[in-house]
Amino acid sequence: MNHLLTIDPSVIDWSRAQFALTAIYHWLFVPLTLGLAVVMGIIETIYYRTGKPFWREAARFWQRLFGVNFAMGVATGIILEFEFGTNWSNYSWFVGDIFGAPLAVEGIVAFFMESTFVAVMFFGWDKVSRGFHLASTWLTGLGATISAWWILVANAWMQYPVGCEFNPDTVRNEMVSFADVALSPFAIDKFFHTVTSSWLVGAVFVCAVSCWFLLRNREKRLAVESIKIAAIVGLVSSLLAMMTGDFSAVKVAKTQPMKLAAMEALYNGGEGVGLTVVAAINPFAQPDYANEKEPPLHLAMPKGLSLLATHSLDGYVPGVNDLLNGYTRPDGKRELSAEEKMERGRRAIASLAEYRTLRAKDANNPKLKELATQLKEDMPYFGYGYIKDRAELVPYIPINFYAFRVMVGVGTLLLLFFIVIGHVAWRMNISRRRTWLYLTALAMLPLVYVASEAGWIVAELGRQPWAIQDMMPTMAAVSDLRSGSVALTFFLFLILFTVLLIAEVRIMCHVIKNYKSPASATE
């Protein structure tokens, strides 16, 4: 990490911007892939059980839309993975043995599984048995879900690094337990929350397209039956997303308390802390954490944050100042202040430098063991050694605060939406002209994407300044590049990904507008 002494700070900013750009675009495609896979799998299952041509054609319609989206997700995902080697080479060197393992499994197992069965799903109609085709459809969705699992395992490890040990001889973190990495509680919660929220995206998409048909007085049976299925999927996934989100909040409170404090704009913690519902935060104000007060127009749910973070009404939740100044936990353990962690981090860096210098001269020097022991004690704070000002440890509060509320607010709205549209679809005649409901469904489509992206903004920006929590700050992970080169590729990716997004929207709109049920699909 010696290049940190000369690296241009703008390289860090451009590299972060490029990764954010590609990740946001990629995530426009992934949740729809996971969500549509469930809906079209259910529809084809009904066809398998009934043998009615209508269900066959319904499955094929949704599979066409799935195929377009699936292709775009693969294209944008490959570019995203390559960025670790180009823009974040120091990160790849430092933890490549660990981070690369789940991505390798994802590529070998999940991606090959998807590639194989997606071909059967699209081209196997009338060429393979109904049962084998149905299995291929479900296995395509399962492959995409397994792919998401391994990618989320890698991301969860960045949030909560486990199953590894630092080797001072190679200056790398090495995996000591694949099971700890793959089955991390943080990874499990992240996976289920991400997948269930993706099912939500798929359900909203199906409802929106179906309501467009009803608004145009077309394909009524396809629209009605699709809404019935999507409403159930959406209602179940809404409840599951809320439940898994609660589990994730508890994990964040334990492992990333600064992220939670930023999400709540909580400067001074305590017991029985309220959950802020509405507040006004000035995004342009220079933060003064020691003197920060509750934001104006502050409306909070009494003891709500303590309940969310600790599952206790009187649970203790630390604020920004508590985390910067150090505090005593309810169990009596003292948490170090930011300055103490930074000092131990600098000591770890100094011990590592001395260890490598001595080892280069004499690999049998008895002092090496002493330095290795000292380094192991200070290694949990290694990343803090690169922090110059404790204010750097606080994520940007306004964007985390509002993004979290957008995610939760839209999620709650979607739950109500699925209750209403499900009731109308199953208990009433939804094909009877209900313009207000059709327009509401169309409005929900952009909202669910905003909520989905907002969740990832909280997950990633709330972790800053860390690339790997407490272990490696973002500025230490970047490659030593010219800022102009990174800026150029940023705009190239912006153009490329925008073209891909426009292409997907145009192709999907073409498929939807020109779809006409064949005469054989009346039964």
Segments (PLM) and residue ranges:
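Aromatic-rich transmembrane-lumenal/periplasmic boundary elements in polytopic membrane proteins
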Residues: 154, 236-347
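Membrane-interface helix-loop-helix modules in multi-pass inner-membrane proteins
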Residues: 69-139, 156, 461-465
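Hydrophobic alpha-helical transmembrane segments
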Residues: 30-39, 109-117, 198-209, 406-422, ...
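Membrane-interface interhelical loops and short amphipathic "cap" helices
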Residues: 1-24, 51-58, 82-104, 156-192, ...
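C-terminal substrate/ligand-recognition segments
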Residues: 388, 392-456, 487-511
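Hydrophobic alpha-helical membrane-insertion segments
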Residues: 67-76, 138-161, 234-245, 441-459
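Membrane-interfacial loop-to-helix junctions in multi-pass inner-membrane proteins
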Residues: 50-68, 94-100, 104, 124-142, ...
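Internal alpha-helical transmembrane segments
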Residues: 119-127, 132-141, 149-157, 178, ...
